[in-house]
Structures are given as C-alpha cells and as structure tokens.
Amino acid sequence: MEDDGKSPPDSAYGEPKKYDPNFKGPIQNRGCTDILCCILIVLGIIAYVAVGIVAWTYGDPRKVIYPTDSKGQFCGQVGTPNEKKPFLFYFNIMKCASPLVLLQFQCPTTQICVENCPDRFLTYLSVATTQQNFDYYKQFCRDGFNNFTKSPVEVLRDRDCPAMITPSKPFTRRCFPAINTQKGVVMVGNSTTFDDGRGDKQRNVTDLLEGAKKANVVLEARQVAMKIFEDYTVSWYWIIIGLIIAMVISLIFVVLLRFLAGIMVWVMIVLVIAVMGYGIFHCYMEYARLKGQSGSDVTLKDIGFQTDIRVYLHLRQTWLAFMIILCILEVIVILLLIFLRKRIMIAIALIKEASRAVGFVMSSLVFPLFTFLLVCLCIAYWAITAVFLSTSNEAVYKVFNETQCDFSGNTCNPETFNTTNVTRVCPDATCQFAFYGGETYYHKYLIVFQIYNAFMFLWLANFVIALGQVTLAGAFASYYWAFKKPDDMPAFPIFSSLGRALRYHTGSLAFGSLILAIVQMIRILLEYLDHKLKGADNKCARFLLCCLKCCFWCLEKFIKFLNRNAYIMIAIYGTNFCTSARNAFFLLMRNIIRVAVLDKVTDFLLFLGKLLVVGCVGILAFFFFSRRIQIVQDTAPTLNYYWVPILTVILGSYLIAHGFFSVYGMCVDTLFLCFLEDLERNDGSTERPYFMSGSLQKLLNKSNQTKPDK
C-alpha cells in the first residue's frame, strides 16, 4: 500500500529537509535559546513570590472560615475572646428581611458570638421583671453588660440585650430559628406565634421565616452544597476505589498496548462499539419499562431543573434522549471506521511503533506524575495566594438604620460613633461591621494583584506542561533516530532530555507558554464580560462578544497545536521557539494530507481508549451507587444525590486515562514528525537509509536497500 500523502510542492512552506549524514537524532551541541523570555519568567516568578509574601502578611483566611460579629471579631477562633463562642446570634433576625440585606449583605441588627444557640422562648421584659432565667438570658447580651440597674427600656434602646430569643438551630455557624412544619402549619418550637419582647401584639412565625430567608440569601444553594458535601463524606473511599480501578485498567491497557498493540486497538474498537450498543439496549429497556407508568410521560421542559437526578430517570423522555444520543455516536464511530479503515492500518502501525518506543523508555510512563505534581504545586500556590489576597482587607464599619436616614451606608468608627451627631439625627442608627475592604494604596490595587496571580498561574502551569512535552519528545526522538535500537540511544533518555530542556530551552518554553497564557487570560476576561452583560439588552454587544469568544477559543486550540509541535522541534534541533514553530508548521503543511488524516486517526484511536476506560468505570459506578448490583447492594452508601460520586468517578477516570494515554499521544506526535522528516531526508538507499521500523516500511511500501555481497 503506497502512501504518498504529500501536498503539491509549494515554496511558501519551505523546501523539504535535505540529507545530513551527521544527523543522528537530538542534537547534543546546542546553545541557550530565547534568553529574554528566560529572564522574564525568572523576574515574573520573583514578583509572584513577592505578591505571595505580601498577601500572606496582610491576609487572614479566618475571614472566610469564621463568621464575624458586629465588631468584626471572629466567632469560635482559637486564641481570641470568642474562642468558646462559635455561633453568630442575631438580636432581631426579623430585621434581616430588610432590602438592605440584598444590597449590603449585612443584617441591620446587632450580632454577637454565643456559645450555644437559644433553645427556648424568652423576652427581656419577662426575665427582667421576674428574674427567672436571667442568668441564661445574659449570655445573649453584649459582652461586658452588667448594669442591672438600667431599666428594660434603656437596655433595649442601647441594644445591650435582645428584646427576645427564640428556639434556634445552628446552620453555617449562625443561629437561625428552629422553624418546622406540622401538617402544613409553620411553627417554631411548638408555637405558631411569639412575643417580640417589645410589648407589641403577638407576632406570627412567618415573620421569623421571612427574616431567616433573607439572613441567608443563598440558603437553598447552601443546603444543596451541604448535601453534596455529605455525599462526599460517606462515599469518598468508594470514589477512591473507583479511581484506583480506573488507574489499574489504564495501566493494564497501556502494558497490553506495549505487547499487543494491533490486537488491543481492534479489541478497543470492538469494545467501544459494544459498550455504546449496550447503552442503547439499556436505554431502550428502561424506555419500554416506563411505558404506562404514571408520571413517566411528563416532558423535560415541564419538570424543569431538579437537583435530584433520579427524578429525570423516571421519565421516558430522558431515556429516549439518551438512546438517540448514543445511536448518533454509534453511527458516527462506525462510519469513521469504515471510511478510515486504510488509514487505521497505518495508524495502528504508528501506535505499534509508539509501543516499542515506550518499551525502550519505560520511565516515560511515570514521568507524567512529575508533571502532575508540579501542576498541583502551581494550583496550590495560586489558590492559597488568592485566598490570602481576598482576605487581606481591613474591617469596614457602616451606619445601619431601620428607617430612612441620610447617614445610612456611610463609613463609621465604632469607638467614636456614639459621640458623633449621627446618633442625634438618627437615634436608631448603629455602627456595625459591614465587610472587609480598605482605602490604602495596597487595598486599591488588590484587583491588580489578583489578576497578576491568575496570569502567573496560567503561565507557570503552561510552562510545566511544556516542560513535560519537550522532555518526552526528546526521549522518543532519540529512540526514532537511533539506527540500532537501543544501542544508539542514551542510557537515560528521559533525564537526558529533561536536562537539555532546563539547561538550554527554559526561555523557549517560557515564550510558548507566555503566548498561550495571554490568550487564556483574554478568554477569562471575555467570560467575565459575558457574565456581566447577561442582563443587558444590547444584542449587538452580546453578538460581538460571542464572536470574540469563539475566535479566541479557536486561537487557543491552534496555539496549543503549534506549541506542541514546536516543542518537538526544540527537543530535536535545539532551535529557538519561533524557528521551531515555523519549521514544524512548514513540515506539517508540506504533508498536510497525512496530518489531516493519519495523525488525527491515531488521536481518534487513543481517544477511544480513554472512552473505553471511562465507559467501563462509569457503568460500574452507576450500577454500584444506584444499588443495582445485588451482591454489594447493602454495601453501597445511602446518598442524597447518587450522581455526585458517579460524575466524580467519571471525571477522575478520564483525567487518569488521559494521563496514561498522553504519553502515547506525545510519543505518536513525536514519531509522526520524525517519520515525516525521515521520508524527506532519506530514500532507502544504502547511503540514505530510512530510520523507520520494518513494519512501517512494509506498510508504506518502502524498504532499505541492502549492500550487495562482494
């Protein structure tokens, strides 16, 4: 089978590589490249460390973890006066129903830290008059309140104590009324009404309910989050077991590819078709089973969004949609296999060659762990710095008032507030902790530091990935260009390639990752603008933004593709980034047919391998967590949403499979570029023999001439 695969000659894409008798693979004698970018990334890292030090100096993560009282003090923080008071108590939670809550995210009522939430109905008037339960009531008064000679009216006026307390339960470290329903009637404790402690008529419990809802605007979202968190706490070890199974399957698959590449690829293709076929069969059986059942004919549009995915599984339309999607995917895969069957044979040969290369460079299978750990380090540094930056603001106090007040919302000082004229003009006004901010030079530029933190994270993460790619490329290129394998290969190909990359090409890797980081940062800013403009009526702006997002998405994909091939050229020839990118692009364009078909076919086959691993583990997780495996039915944990661990296992399995198959992907890409250069440099003669394996030569109808016997 002859496979020319070249595009017509075009000088615009340069001349084919000429034969060089001295070329034996990755060049050893090379110099430093893109030194300016190397200096830039070093300076960037120094500045990044400086930003981190400043953030860690001024930041305080306690502001995220612990609630704060009206004085800005933390509740439950070890080493503070409130160490034994972990819960936040609202003097009058009904005031949280004020629209100010939605504008300023703070209730216009006094808030203190308490040891326990109240468990009974009491009013200050009743305890002050009878002295019963007074010691219990005092724990809900301001710290230091001991002037028992003050009249109840003065105590309530000065907000020394709450007018009433109600049975409450802690939620997210805050005391909320213990509201429940009995036979559809809203109650708190065992009552539907309560005394507000101000001598007014009995108030309805629904007033408390309204205040509690506004006190926590995201109460329902937090409840869902808490349920998801609970699911993780009872299923985390099963999730880990599922991920271990995915790792074992991926490892077995990669090892089998090493020895049985051709058979494994065809087995993989058949299994993918079989798995999707079973999915279609299962969806049809569920669709047929639900026929005639009450409520199963409700449409997805009518039922709307539900957090419990089990609701959707009782609808026939859900299983019909799944079946249609799987049928479309099945047809697409089968058609691709039919039309690409000839190219698949060449792709299998390339995968076989990649398997041999991995066999000679076995350390390449564990090298992605090094890259993974470095990426995790980048993520950890970015996340910690972001938290410290976001919590490095100072406590800001604002004027809060129940009624209309000209000073409402102004900044105030709680130490001197009672001596100002604000209390004379607005007697009900209070100076309370509002949020964390600041007016200093540092606080004004916090957003700049956050943007720099995000940008440096993208730059360093892309740099680490680039380092991994160029290291693997150098190792696999040394395999391909070794005429006598493994005699002509270095003793430690991975370490040799890593050393060359760090010593000579840090600047080139920084250059490529910088370009990619800039494009990714622009995409993030466009997403932010899109989020801000969602409520806008300007359709022209929305359309323009959508076009920009699409263009930069395509640009990012192209740059990733170009960078990947440029790193291969850097690993082989030691040229700078721009030269390597140009040479790689021209080489690919001179062989555009092979690139468009052969290289993408191998990517498709490797993707099927990932799909097979994810499909096997995903189906197993679905049957286990939905309690459909009789043998281990009692072992499966009881969950609020069983899709939570299933989706986690599926996502984790894909990342694990991607980690293992990425080695093969980089190996295939490297061998592919070497393969193209081999065809351009050599012709199979005794003077210019091919470096490709005998199986590839046979498949392409190429051969090396042997020297005639004398």
UniProtKB/Swiss-Prot annotation:
Membrane-crossing segments per the record: 35-55, 237-257, 261-281, 320-340, 369-389, 459-481, 509-529, 568-588, 604-624, 643-663
- Give the UniProt keywords, A-Z: Antiport, Cell membrane, Glycoprotein, Membrane, Mitochondrion, Mitochondrion outer membrane, Phosphoprotein, Transmembrane, Transmembrane helix, Transport
Q: Name one GO cellular component term.
A: mitochondrial outer membrane
Q: What are the BP-aspect GO terms?
A: choline transport; ethanolamine transport; transmembrane transport
Task: Please give the residue ranges for the topological domain Cytoplasmic.
Answer: 1-34, 258-260, 341-368, 482-508, 589-603, 664-710
Localized where? Cell membrane; Mitochondrion outer membrane
Q: Which residues lie on this side of the membrane: Extracellular?
A: 56-236, 282-319, 390-458, 530-567, 625-642
Disulfide-bond pairs as recorded: none
Glycosylation positions? 147, 190, 204, 401, 418, 421
Q: Does the keyword Membrane apply?
A: yes
Function in brief:
Choline/H+ antiporter, mainly in mitochodria. Also acts as a low-affinity ethanolamine/H+ antiporter, regulating the supply of extracellular ethanolamine (Etn) for the CDP-Etn pathway, redistribute intracellular Etn and balance the CDP-Cho and CDP-Etn arms of the Kennedy pathway.
Q: Which family does it belong to?
A: Belongs to the CTL (choline transporter-like) family.
Question: What name goes with this protein?
Answer: Choline transporter-like protein 2
